[in-house]
Swiss-Prot record:
Pfam assignment, any one: DBI_PRT
Sequence similarity: Belongs to the CobT family.
EC numbers, comma separated: 2.4.2.21
Gene Ontology MF term list: nicotinate-nucleotide-dimethylbenzimidazole phosphoribosyltransferase activity
Designated name of the protein: Nicotinate-nucleotide--dimethylbenzimidazole phosphoribosyltransferase
InterPro entries for the chain: Nict_dMeBzImd_PRibTrfase (IPR003200), Nict_dMeBzImd_PRibTrfase_bact (IPR017846), Nict_dMeBzImd_PRibTrfase_N (IPR023195), Nict_dMeBzImd_PRibTrfase_sf (IPR036087)
Main function: Catalyzes the synthesis of alpha-ribazole-5'-phosphate from nicotinate mononucleotide (NAMN) and 5,6-dimethylbenzimidazole (DMB).
Organism from which the protein derives: Brucella anthropi (strain ATCC 49188 / DSM 6882 / CCUG 24695 / JCM 21032 / LMG 3331 / NBRC 15819 / NCTC 12168 / Alc 37)
The keyword Glycosyltransferase appears for this protein: yes
Catalytic activity as recorded in UniProt: 5,6-dimethylbenzimidazole + nicotinate beta-D-ribonucleotide = alpha-ribazole 5'-phosphate + nicotinate + H(+)
Active-site residues, as the UniProt record annotates them: E306
Keyword Protein biosynthesis found: no
Length: 339
């Protein structure tokens, strides 16, 4: 905690003073790309990805040796409003499934040689029901962000962030509405299958929550504490920690992007080291990416969470780095360049 004793002060200071990109490393990558055995620009966005890796790792030949998927799990008091077809107990059951290797994210990590860590965030203690009270007080929220910063402990050179939490698309929609305005209908989607009356209750919950806390939503970190979830606060912390340690980040779907959006609202440059792995089928996600000016890497109609979209995108990032470092130059291969 800062000397002032206010829980968020250290994070506000951090967000104001983030390290920038290494433009020299980015330039070196662009220069090497021009010499590789391919027409200029023919690898399309893969070339931009390598330049992004160089800028945020500071390495002129970026390599991905220890990629990690970090999945944060949290429960939400707002589920008491009967907004989702699944009970909150499913969150803990899915954490057990991750540990047993039985989830989709386990298979994608195996297929792409990615590490996996799962962080259980006090599942037995849901956050406050945001339609009646703040999700967290500032001290709890700040402590959870600090916990999320530990995701990079042990070392990684590419961090993919994802989540698990019954009810958390409601939370993401409330955050998006508070940060970017519009109507609840702009941001609320079916999530894990909320239709009919469930969807109407979900819409009502988002409206009620934002109206209840409206006087306290001018500061993005207060938006996080009042409307957020533990997994969302932890993901925000992980994104910040990665920035400080020169670790590029791949963000997963709607809920993970809501964590990034809090940082973006505080400082638009705070997520420049983030690549958005995919656009979810959850309708609010595309709008949220547009608000932040971010282009997703994949569009596959996915809406599972768990970091699955980020993990699939990591395979492309790994391939981009290998193409850059492993391809021969025209001179090395004895191939004539363009006239």
């Amino acid at each position: 905690m800062s000397a002032s004793g206010l829980p968020f002060d250290d994070f506000r200071e951090l967000i104001r003073n983030l390290p920038g990109p290494d433009l020299g490393a980015e330039r070196a990558v662009r220069e090497r790309e021009a010499t590789l055995t391919k027409p200029a620009g023919s690898l399309g966005r893969m070339e931009d990805i390598v330049a992004w890796l160089a800028a945020w790792t500071g390495k002129r030949t970026p390599q991905i040796n220890r990629p990690l998927v970090a999945v944060f799990a949290g429960n939400h008091g707002v589920t008491a409003k009967n907004i989702t077809p699944f009970p909150p107990s499913v969150t803990a059951q899915m954490v057990e499934n991750f540990a047993a290797g039985g989830a989709a994210i386990n298979q994608i990590c195996i297929a792409n040689d990615l590490g996996l860590k799962v962080f259980d965030l006090a599942l037995e203690h849901p956050t406050g029901d945001i339609t009646e009270e703040p999700a967290m007080d500032e001290r709890t929220c700040a402590a959870t962000m600090a916990f999320g910063m530990e995701a990079i402990a042990g070392g990684t050179d590419l961090l993919c962030i994802g989540e698990m939490g019954i009810g958390n698309t409601t939370i993401a929609a409330a955050i998006a509405l508070a940060l970017f305005g519009g109507t609840a209908e702009d941001w609320v989607g079916p999530g894990t299958g909320s239709t009919g009356e469930l969807l109407q209750r979900k819409l009502a919950a988002v409206r009620q929550a934002v109206a209840l806390h409206q006087a306290h939503l001018q500061d993005p970190l207060e938006v996080l504490s009042r409307l957020g979830g533990r997994e969302i606060a932890a993901m925000a912390g992980a994104i910040l920690a990665a920035r400080m340690e020169k670790i590029p980040v791949i963000v997963d779907g709607f809920v993970a992007s809501a964590a990034a959006a809090v940082l973006y609202a505080a400082n638009p440059e705070a997520i420049d080291h983030c690549l958005f792995g995919h656009v979810s089928a959850e309708p609010g996600h595309r709008k949220l990416l547009e608000k932040m000016g971010k282009q997703p890497l994949l569009d596959m109609g996915m809406r599972l969470g768990e970091g699955t979209g980020a993990a699939l995108a990591a395979s492309i990032v790994k391939a981009a780095a290998l193409c850059h470092s492993g391809m021969a130059t025209f001179e090395q291969a004895g191939i004539s360049g363009s006239k």
